[in-house]
Structures are given as structure tokens and as C-alpha cells.
């Protein structure tokens, strides 16, 4: 559930920066923004990566979430719904921003309806 609080610990609704390995080669990756959607039972964060690549707009696994302070150029962003990342709290490089509640709820609704989250 949505509960952002910029207190140093990441919470659902916050966008944080962390290392995300590439799917095709997990030994490589890049630092990128991730929307925290929940906590796993072991305390790790569950998150969805963001992208500002415009070609994501036509991909059904990417949901447009608009622009926000997580992109310093103010570009529209997209959240990837079909790849959930498990991120240890110590793996977060920095807290970035809070996603507005209405946009977070849209992401949550898509996860529930299309991906079986509850």
C-alpha cells in the first residue's frame, strides 16, 4: 500500500536509485530509478524499474506514469510491470522522489488485474 515517507528507509510509493542488472547479462547493468511497490517477507524491497525511453509507450508491459522529479530532464516515464526486482535496503544508492498517489494506484491496479498481485 502507498506509504511514502522520505525518512531514509524506502517505502512503497517512493522512487529510489539502485543498480539494476541487465536481463541478458546479470554481471552488467546500470544505476536506474525504481518504484518501490512492496516489501518482501525478508525485508527486501520489491520494485519496478522506470525508463524514459519513448519506444516503451507501445509495449504492453510498460505503463506510462508521466514525468516527475526522478527524471532531471522532465521526460515522461514508463514503469515496467513484468519484471519485479528484489532490492536489499543496503542496495539503494539514494532516495529520489515520491510518485503521486493517483499514479501509484494506477500501477497497483495494473499489477492486480494483469499480473495477479493482491
Where are these regions (language model features)?
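Short alpha-helix capping/helix-loop boundary micro-motifs
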Residues: 1-5, 22
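Beta-hairpin (beta-strand-turn-beta-strand) motif
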Residues: 21, 50-52, 84
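Short N-terminal helix-initiation segments at or just after the protein's N-terminus
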Residues: 24-29, 114-116
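Compact nucleic-acid interaction/catalytic patches
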Residues: 26-31, 36-69
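C-terminal terminal-subdomain/extension
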Residues: 66-118
Amino acid at each position: 500500500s502507498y506509504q511514502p515517507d522520505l525518512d531514509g528507509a524506502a517505502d512503497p510509493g517512493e522512487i529510489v536509485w539502485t543498480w539494476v542488472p541487465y536481463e541478458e547479462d546479470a554481471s552488467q547493468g546500470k544505476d536506474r530509478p525504481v518504484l518501490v511497490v512492496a516489501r518482501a517477507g525478508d525485508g527486501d524491497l520489491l520494485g519496478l524499474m522506470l525508463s524514459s525511453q519513448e519506444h516503451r509507450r507501445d509495449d504492453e508491459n510498460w505503463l506510462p506514469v508521466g514525468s516527475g522529479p526522478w527524471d532531471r530532464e522532465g521526460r515522461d516515464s514508463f514503469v515496467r510491470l513484468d519484471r519485479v526486482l528484489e532490492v536489499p535496503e543496503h542496495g539503494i544508492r539514494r532516495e529520489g522522489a515520491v510518485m503521486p498517489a493517483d499514479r501509484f494506484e494506477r500501477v497497483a491496479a495494473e499489477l492486480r488485474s494483469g499480473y495477479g498481485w493482491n
